[in-house]
């Protein structure tokens, strides 16, 4: 069967002009005009999509099939061109019958032209073919326009859906023109209104927590600040958290003599049940001579020191992707879960604005992965935000997954971010040593976003930066009061 592209070539019909007219009409439609006025950042993104539309329309016209009636008429026209005038006179009745049978727009005019002239001359033969060709060109142009109109309606419907989605998410995820362009590209997926409303919900929550949003922005630009001390700088008071040894239930270190009843050795406790040794037990208790487990750990305390005022020179450095590990244990549920998800949404916003990648890993008893900056980023973000935090805590597996990804060529300059309350078991020595090796040799940086003030210092000391956001009730009330 004849294709429309072949027909256009045969009749010298310019499909490019028809495509350009259709695209101009689409961009000038009232729906797009209102949208461009409301969201100017997305205007450039949609305009950049025009070449793709043009190519899709060309492909549609190229693959379209010509109706059988028009195909038969074109074949008859081509055969008639090869006839001499005497041969044409002989074939003319069959040609007129064929045009009538095919309901050709040229049929009635052709018969009138023949009836108006008693003799078929060479000039009339040429005129007949010229007008027939014009009729075929009109039919081919009409067919092109019909197909383009169908495509225009379909394209307008698709663009309106994407405009609705992008318009809802633009205030949340698009910080500049780069982010707006990437957001428009990601809006091509099949999403329903109820799906992306989850992103809107967490975006609103993030706006209600400006400290959390500010923390994400500081983490995102932390590579560009370079401190330059001055000899004549004034002194300022600086508060810092320091580690110091403490007896906390973190790790059993050995045995000691004390009066700690809660950590008695079983043999000591057994003497309490023997009447002859009961007084001996109490004597050793008073003298702190009972054998107990010795605990070793570290705690944090606030220390005030004075230091010179530091002036910062912002020297732009290359910024790599984010690899974000999120703790989904039961202790991270509730408000912690909301904060962790909103923080990841803020990092996604930064990644879109700075053309970086944002890779999320959820760790509990297994690792679940999402890439929020890819072509399916919105769908991945919705799946991530739909997850519930009810698992256990396997921080070691999280670090192993991070280190495995950092060894890949495309992630060599990534920043690793771990979001947790850090109430977990101590990390194995092999994991700790590998992290230190990555920090020392490859300059990889590990960030901790601590959602609790009770995180274990033994775990957190391996991080380059610790960003604290206490989600306890007291801290939440203080933040609300300050606002």
UniProtKB/Swiss-Prot annotation:
Alphabetic keyword roster: Chaperone, Cytoplasm
InterPro entries in the record: Uncharacterised_CoxE (IPR008912), Uncharacterised_ViaA (IPR023481), VWF_A (IPR002035), vWFA_dom_sf (IPR036465)
Gene3D superfamilies, sorted: von Willebrand factor, type A domain
One Pfam family per UniProt: VWA_CoxE
Domain of life from the UniProt record: Bacteria
Subcellular location as annotated: Cytoplasm
Record's GO cellular component terms: cytosol
SUPFAM superfamilies, A to Z: vWA-like
Assembly description: Homodimer. Interacts with RavA.
Stored HAMAP family: ViaA (MF_01626)
Family assignment from sequence similarity: Belongs to the ViaA family.
Primary role: Component of the RavA-ViaA chaperone complex, which may act on the membrane to optimize the function of some of the respiratory chains. ViaA stimulates the ATPase activity of RavA.
Name of the protein: Regulatory protein ViaA
């Amino acid at each position: 069967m004849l294709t429309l592209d072949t027909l256009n070539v045969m009749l010298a019909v310019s499909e490019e002009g028809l495509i350009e007219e259709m695209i101009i009409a689409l961009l000038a439609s009232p729906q797009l005009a209102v949208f461009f006025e409301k969201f100017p950042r997305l205007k450039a993104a949609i305009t950049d999509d025009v070449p793709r539309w043009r190519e899709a329309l060309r492909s549609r016209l190229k693959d379209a099939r010509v109706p059988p009636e028009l195909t038969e008429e074109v074949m008859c026209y081509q055969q008639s061109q090869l006839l001499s005038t005497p041969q044409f006179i002989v074939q003319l009745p069959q040609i007129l019958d064929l045009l009538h049978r095919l309901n050709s727009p040229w049929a009635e005019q052709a018969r009138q032209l023949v009836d108006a002239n008693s003799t078929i001359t060479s000039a009339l033969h040429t005129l007949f073919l010229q007008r027939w060709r014009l009729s075929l060109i009109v039919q081919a142009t009409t067919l092109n326009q019909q197909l383009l109109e169908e495509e225009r309606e379909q394209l307008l419907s698709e663009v309106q859906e994407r405009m609705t989605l992008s318009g809802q998410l633009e205030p949340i995820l698009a910080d500049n023109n780069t982010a707006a362009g990437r957001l428009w590209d990601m809006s091509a997926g099949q999403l329903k209104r109820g799906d992306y409303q989850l992103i809107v919900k967490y975006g609103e929550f993030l706006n209600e927590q400006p400290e959390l949003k500010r923390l994400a922005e500081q983490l995102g630009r932390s590579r560009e600040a370079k401190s330059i001390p001055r000899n004549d700088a004034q002194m300022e008071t600086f508060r810092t958290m320091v580690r110091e040894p403490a007896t906390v239930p973190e790790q059993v270190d050995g045995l000691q003599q004390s009066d700690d009843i809660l950590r008695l050795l079983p043999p000591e406790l057994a003497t309490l049940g023997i009447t002859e040794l009961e007084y001996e037990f109490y004597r050793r208790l008073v003298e702190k001579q009972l054998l107990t487990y010795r605990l070793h750990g570290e705690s944090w305390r606030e220390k005030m020191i004075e230091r010179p005022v530091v002036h910062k020179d912002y020297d732009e450095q290359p910024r790599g992707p984010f690899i974000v590990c999120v703790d989904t244990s039961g202790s991270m549920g509730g408000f912690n879960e909301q904060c962790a998800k909103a923080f990841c949404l803020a990092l996604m916003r930064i990644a879109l604005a700075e053309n970086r990648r944002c890779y999320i890993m959820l760790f509990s008893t297994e690792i679940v992965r999402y890439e929020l900056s890819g072509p399916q980023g919105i769908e991945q973000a919705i799946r991530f935000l739909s997850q519930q935090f009810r698992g256990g805590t396997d921080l070691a597996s999280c670090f192993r997954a991070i280190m495995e990804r950092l060894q890949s060529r495309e992630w060599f300059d990534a920043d690793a971010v771990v979001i947790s309350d850090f109430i977990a078991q101590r990390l194995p020595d092999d994991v700790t040593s590998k992290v230190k090796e990555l920090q020392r040799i490859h300059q990889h940086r590990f960030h901790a976003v601590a959602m609790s003030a009770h995180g274990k210092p033994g775990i957190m000391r391996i991080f380059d930066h610790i960003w604290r956001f206490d989600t306890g009730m007291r801290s939440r009330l203080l933040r609300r009061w300050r606002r």
